[in-house]
Amino acid sequence: MAELKITQVRGTIGARWNQRESLRTLGLRKIRQSVVREDNAQTRGLIKTVHHLVVVEEV
């Protein structure tokens, strides 16, 4: 399966609770931190919640 590189580019100050929890679930804690995750429906749903806080690249 394909993998996605997810990088947090904006902070969570002023973000809603579910957006903060989605970032934590993805494994992101700091700005400019990147993680590689499998491309599946669960990951896509989390990204959809925080699309304005992250940048997604296909690896």
From Swiss-Prot:
One GO-annotated biological process of the protein: translation
InterPro entries linked to this entry: Ribo_uL30_ferredoxin-like_sf (IPR036919), Ribosomal_uL30_bac-type (IPR005996), Ribosomal_uL30_CS (IPR018038), Ribosomal_uL30_ferredoxin-like (IPR016082)
One term under GO cellular component: cytosolic large ribosomal subunit
MF terms in GO: structural constituent of ribosome
Entry keyword set: Ribonucleoprotein, Ribosomal protein
Subunit structure: Part of the 50S ribosomal subunit.
Matching NCBIfam families: rpmD_bact
Family, per entry: Belongs to the universal ribosomal protein uL30 family.
Entry protein name: Large ribosomal subunit protein uL30
Organism listed in the record: Mycobacterium sp. (strain JLS)
